A protein has these predicted regions:
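Active-site-adjacent loop/helix surface patches within enzyme catalytic domains
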Residues: 2-97
Length: 97
């Protein structure tokens, strides 16, 4: 079965990161939340993930005002949880403290 990937229609800001592994090797069957410490904006996280030196990313981020940013399209594996096996099958979402 081939999975059709879509990106959330809740996204209000997009800045695609170079930090990903390309096409997934597993269909999406989980969500992985990840915490970003600090009061970031969707744009600020996009700027951080846009740096190749960061070597991190997520599919989405939800900022301090509840705005959703897209950083790695769902069809691609982000570099979020430090687990290839997890990130291949998860939509990863950074949230803010």
């Amino acid at each position: 079965m081939t999975m059709a990937y879509t990106n959330s229609n809740l996204v209000v800001y997009t800045k695609l990161s170079p930090n990903h592994s390309g096409a997934r090797t597993h269909s999406i069957d989980r969500i992985t939340p990840h915490c970003v410490v600090g009061q970031c904006t969707a744009e600020g996280l996009g700027d951080w993930f846009a740096k190749s030196s960061t070597q991190a990313s997520s599919n989405y981020g939800i900022d301090k005002d509840g705005r959703v940013g897209l950083y790695v399209e769902e069809k691609n594996r982000s570099w979020c949880s430090s687990s290839n096996a997890n990130d291949q099958r998860a939509v990863t979402i950074d949230t803010y403290l």
